[in-house]
């Protein structure tokens, strides 16, 4: 969730924000910045380390600390220009010191920045350099694991996370490493369908973030991620509790605002959903937020405003024409979801799979293939998406629609029922479509049919039992 975009598009990101907020008239919806009254801690840190470097431009440690302040600002605001600045600061640091163990922290930070920029192989290389400089050091392991997970190398990712979790006890407390182990490992646990374990990891991470007095955004992100897990499992009240806690920790946090928009839509409170999404878009107009806002307008019977938002997503896509590394998957899914620019959707999904062989890239490819009439290939791609046993209603919905198009009604029913069993409100438009598709297959979506699908596993976090989809591969 933390991934942002490539550093080479940092200035483009600011251009998108300015053009979108100005051209589409949403800037006026943004509340006044709290920094006008209270100095922003990240800005203060940036100015402090800039001043230190002005006095001593050859002290490489100050470059590392400045990079950390820039990266934190990027996470807080969604403005990836700060990741570009962080990368530049780290490059200066490594020019001064790159071969001794003192350089390891810079390589660890560079791995984190490259992950945020979706440069996953470079992130893996950075982490490897850090580990080679200080064998046995734990700092690089979370990012080594993250890079492999993003590239779909799940067994290798697990090895790194296990090394982090099972580090030898040296008799000293390492609370920061414990937080990183809990929060990073939870993502892989979720992908592997271990939802109980993923939830426990994030719950522990939230407690540790509070105990460690981490920056407000770090706590807000952890609360947000826990809320995301609850939403995925259809536990709307718990999801709302965590997202509101995220907003208490960091007011105007765009991720939590968008999450609340999705929760309100699932609750049928569409006007409130629109308000939350509009606030998120005003802060940072990410395509996924704008598309979701359009979907809520469509669900509320306002096709004109929905189309306006959809055109805004296309506008963002045009501005990113030079380099679409970050938004490939989001744009591919948007085009496929709304039957727009379908050949382009397929091209974007294929391009994304070149660098990310993870389950979600396979899902995007499967959906784009279906919409382009390539049903056989879509079945192959959706099997790849389901291979880890990930509990995700949208994956199951896509699988159900693909098998319906292929004429395999038994599998279609199994996947559509599973989607609604996981979360009957998983999407403001597609959950109703899943129910209609089941009706067309002469199967009434009901509590009884969902509860009968209880073969293996658990939906976790107190959720209902789950069933492996018919014919689906859950091998790692």
Which residues does each PLM region occupy?
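Structural motif corresponding to the intra-repeat A-B loop/turn of tetratricopeptide repeats
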Residues: 73, 77-80, 117, 151, ...
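TPR alpha-solenoid repeat register
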Residues: 62, 103-106, 140, 174, ...
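Canonical tetratricopeptide repeat
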Residues: 65, 109, 143, 184, ...
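Flexible helix-coil transition and linker loops at the boundaries of alpha-helical arrays
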Residues: 50-58, 92-105, 166-176, 208-219, ...
């Amino acid at each position: 969730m933390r991934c942002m975009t490539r550093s080479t598009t940092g200035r483009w990101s600011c251009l998108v924000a300015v053009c979108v907020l100005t051209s589409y008239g949403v800037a006026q919806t943004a509340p006044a910045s709290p920094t006008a009254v209270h100095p922003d801690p990240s800005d203060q840190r940036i100015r402090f380390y800039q001043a230190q470097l002005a006095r001593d431009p050859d002290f490489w440690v100050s470059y590392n600390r400045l990079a950390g302040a820039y990266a934190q600002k990027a996470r807080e605001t969604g403005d990836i220009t700060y990741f570009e600045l962080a990368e530049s600061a780290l490059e200066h640091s490594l020019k001064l010191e790159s071969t001794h163990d003192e350089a390891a922290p810079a390589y660890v930070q560079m791995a984190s920045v490259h992950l945020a920029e979706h440069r996953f192989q470079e992130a893996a290389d950075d982490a490897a350099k850090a580990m080679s400089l200080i064998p046995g050091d734990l700092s690089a392991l979370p990012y080594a694991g993250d890079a492999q997970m993003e590239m779909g190398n799940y067994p290798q990712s697990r090895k790194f996370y296990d090394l982090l979790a099972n580090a030898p006890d040296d008799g000293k407390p390492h609370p920061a490493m414990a937080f990183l182990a809990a929060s990073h490992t939870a993502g892989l646990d979720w992908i592997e369908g271990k939802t109980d374990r993923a939830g426990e990891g994030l719950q522990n991470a939230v407690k540790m973030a509070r105990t460690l007095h981490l920056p407000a955004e770090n706590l807000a992100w952890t609360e947000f991620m826990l809320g995301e897990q609850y939403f995925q499992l259809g536990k709307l009240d718990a999801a709302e509790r965590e997202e509101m806690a995220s907003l208490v920790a960091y007011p105007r946090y765009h991720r939590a605002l968008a999450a609340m928009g999705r929760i309100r839509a699932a609750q049928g409170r569409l006007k409130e959903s629109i308000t939350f999404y509009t606030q998120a878009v005003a802060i940072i107009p990410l395509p996924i937020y704008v598309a979701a806002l359009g979907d809520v307008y469509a669900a509320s019977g306002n096709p004109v405003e929905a189309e306006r938002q959809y055109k805004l997503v296309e506008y963002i896509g045009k501005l990113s024409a030079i380099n679409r590394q970050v938004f490939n998957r989001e744009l591919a899914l948007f085009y496929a979801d709304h039957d727009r620019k379908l050949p382009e959707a397929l091209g974007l999904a294929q391009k994304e799979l070149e660098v990310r062989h993870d389950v979600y890239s396979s899902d995007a490819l499967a959906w784009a293939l279906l919409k382009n009439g390539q049903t056989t290939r879509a079945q192959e791609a959706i099997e790849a998406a389901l291979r880890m046993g990930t509990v995700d209603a949208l994956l199951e919905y896509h699988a159900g629609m693909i098998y319906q198009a292929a004429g395999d009604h038994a599998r279609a029913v199994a996947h559509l029922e599973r989607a609604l069993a996981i979360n009957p409100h998983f999407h403001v438009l597609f959950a109703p479509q899943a129910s209609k598709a089941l009706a067309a297959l002469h199967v009434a979506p009901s509590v009884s049919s969902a509860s009968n699908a209880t073969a293996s596993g658990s939906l976790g976090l107190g959720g209902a039992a789950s069933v492996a989809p018919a014919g689906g591969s859950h091998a790692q």
